[in-house]
């Protein structure tokens, strides 16, 4: 299970992700080769599209619907853990839809209900930039969470949507934890202690996620790991387990959200190398199963209720 992949943007831009390609990091055949059976697909609204964010996210949802309709035997949308299990049993990829950047709501809380009806079950408030909901990791404009951001979080929790704190500023992160209850996730964020970067989380933030029964998905982007090598990803997994415990670490590859390649993990088809690396570092099967999906599914079950 991968908590964050951006390939749906490629599909929306008319790249055929139903055929195996050497382009990018992923497509449907390579996801299968890599053993991914649950994929959270990011519906990313770039800041340049913020002025028509709701229209943009609807375009991305339409692109997913076309993909799913044309490939019914291969994948399906999952809005519950029970649906994930049914899709897994059928040998189909379970697709969880997640908005990246709350600018997708166009400043209207009611749009949350609209995207929920379309199958969206997770959302981050910002990307790197600040918006009308909160400050992002790379820009301070509001001093944290805004009143509108609080309204959005309230409605998300009423709907049973998963709150993703990746891309938030530190102040926004703590504000979100103060006004929400239950598990929170950071879908694609690493340990700042190993790789200092505003997009990574410090030890206290990681511990706070663990106290809330949440998870952090380790990001494969070399800028956030400290270098383009599988070993650096394994280092972050090991460190985050040390800080958070083995029940709170997951994977959030960010594949197709960055350029270049990671040695020994060049694309999603090479994910078995990560499993082998965990075995080589002495992790037992139970811990590896948690990292590869068990921890994230536990959070989904607690928030979704089924």
Describe each model-derived feature in a short phrase:
Residues 108-112, 172-182:
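Distinct, well-ordered alpha-helical segments
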Residues 142-159, 176-186, 243, 274:
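Alpha-helix-loop-beta-strand connector modules within alpha/beta enzyme cores
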Residues 75-78, 161-168:
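Catalytic beta/alpha-barrel core
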Residues 93, 153-161, 281:
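Short, surface-exposed connector motifs at secondary-structure boundaries
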Residues 1-142, 147, 192, 196-251, ...:
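N-terminal hydrophobic targeting/anchoring segments and the immediately downstream early-domain regions
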Residues 129, 168-169:
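A generic "binding-loop/recognition-motif" signal
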Residues 163, 179, 209-213:
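Short gly/pro-enriched beta-turn/loop segments at secondary-structure junctions
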């Amino acid at each position: 299970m991968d908590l964050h992949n951006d390939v749906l943007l490629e599909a929306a831009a008319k790249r055929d992700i139903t055929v195996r390609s050497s382009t990018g990091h992923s497509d449907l055949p390579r996801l299968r080769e890599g053993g991914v059976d649950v994929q959270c697909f990011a519906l990313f609204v770039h800041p340049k599209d913020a002025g028509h964010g709701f229209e943009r996210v609807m375009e991305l949802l339409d692109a997913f619907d076309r993909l799913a309709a044309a490939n019914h035997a291969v994948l399906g949308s999952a809005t519950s853990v029970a649906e994930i299990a049914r899709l897994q049993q059928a040998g189909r990829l379970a697709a969880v839809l997640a908005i990246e950047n709350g600018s997708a709501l166009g400043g209207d809380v009611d749009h949350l209900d609209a995207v929920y009806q379309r199958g969206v079950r997770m959302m981050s408030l910002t990307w790197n930039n600040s918006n009308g909901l909160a400050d992002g990791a790379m820009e301070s404009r509001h001093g944290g969470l805004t009143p509108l951001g609080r309204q959005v979080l309230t409605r998300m929790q009423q709907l049973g949507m998963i709150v993703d704190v990746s891309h938030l500023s530190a102040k926004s992160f703590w504000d979100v934890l103060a006004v929400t209850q239950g598990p929170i996730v950071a879908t694609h964020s690493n340990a700042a202690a190993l790789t200092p970067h505003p997009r990574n989380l410090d030890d206290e933030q990681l511990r706070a996620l663990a106290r809330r029964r949440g998870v952090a998905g380790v990001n494969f982007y070399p800028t956030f790991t400290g270098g383009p090598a599988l070993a650096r990803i394994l280092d972050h997994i090991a460190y985050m387990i040390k800080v958070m415990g083995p029940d709170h670490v997951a994977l959030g590859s960010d594949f197709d959200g960055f350029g270049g390649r990671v040695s020994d993990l060049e694309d999603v088809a090479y994910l078995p190398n990560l499993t082998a690396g965990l075995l080589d570092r002495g992790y037992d099967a139970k811990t590896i199963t948690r990292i590869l999906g068990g921890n994230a599914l536990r959070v989904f079950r607690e928030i979704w209720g089924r």
